[in-house]
């Protein structure tokens, strides 16, 4: 299946000059969403994954059905102040400022094999932060899966030491 045909491109959103790749049109098509989920599950099974991790919000949309299909758990990575129990945090730089992501301190057990999922790889900052959180808890990142990779933003450089797959790529 050619998933690219199900991606909507929204010009000049969220700001002028940006061509936003919208995956909601994959999600609202049961066949396309199921296909994407199944492909990531196949990838994960080859890596003997124990738990799936995904950053909010679209990492949840990808990771939860994958975890459910595999009969394993899902651990969310969220913005600061959104998780109710004790958390670990990771602060990282954005173009104009910083951002903080958190994860429950007991979400990952040392030695667990982790798949990180998200909708899209752009600059790599969010996924790099998720990796740091998982590894701080003693997890082993055995794979990272995306629906889309924007190759022209070169986010892969931040995570080049990890096994990464994407179902769709855009060169420009």
UniProtKB/Swiss-Prot annotation:
It is found in: Cytoplasm. It comes from Staphylococcus aureus (strain NCTC 8325 / PS 47). Pathway: Purine metabolism; AMP biosynthesis via salvage pathway; AMP from adenine: step 1/1. Belongs to the purine/pyrimidine phosphoribosyltransferase family. Disulfide bonds: none annotated. InterPro entries: Ade_phspho_trans (IPR005764), PRibTrfase_dom (IPR000836), PRTase-like (IPR029057), UPRTase/APRTase (IPR050054). GO terms for molecular function: adenine binding; adenine phosphoribosyltransferase activity; AMP binding. The gene is apt. Keywords: Cytoplasm, Glycosyltransferase, Purine salvage, Transferase. Its EC number is 2.4.2.7. One of its GO terms (cellular component) is cytoplasm. This is Adenine phosphoribosyltransferase. It is an enzyme of class 2 (transferase). Catalyzes a salvage reaction resulting in the formation of AMP, that is energically less costly than de novo synthesis.
């Amino acid at each position: 299946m050619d998933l690219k045909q199900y991606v909507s491109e929204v010009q000049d959103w969220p700001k002028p000059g940006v061509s936003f790749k919208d995956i909601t049109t994959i999600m609202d098509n049961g066949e396309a969403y199921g296909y994407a989920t199944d492909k990531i599950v196949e990838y994960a099974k080859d890596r003997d994954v124990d738990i799936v991790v995904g950053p909010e919000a679209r990492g949840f949309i990808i990771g939860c059905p994958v975890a459910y299909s595999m009969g394993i758990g899902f651990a969310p990575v969220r913005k600061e102040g959104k998780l109710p129990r004790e958390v670990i945090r990771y602060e990282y730089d954005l173009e104009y400022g910083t951002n903080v992501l958190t994860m429950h301190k007991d979400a990952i057990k040392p030695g667990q094999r982790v798949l990180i999922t998200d909708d899209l790889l752009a600059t790599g900052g969010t996924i790099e932060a998720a990796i740091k959180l998982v590894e701080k808890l003693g997890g082993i990142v055995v794979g990272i899966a995306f629906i889309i990779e924007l190759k022209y933003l070169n986010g892969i450089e931040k995570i080049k030491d990890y096994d990464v797959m994407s179902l769709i790529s855009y060169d420009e």
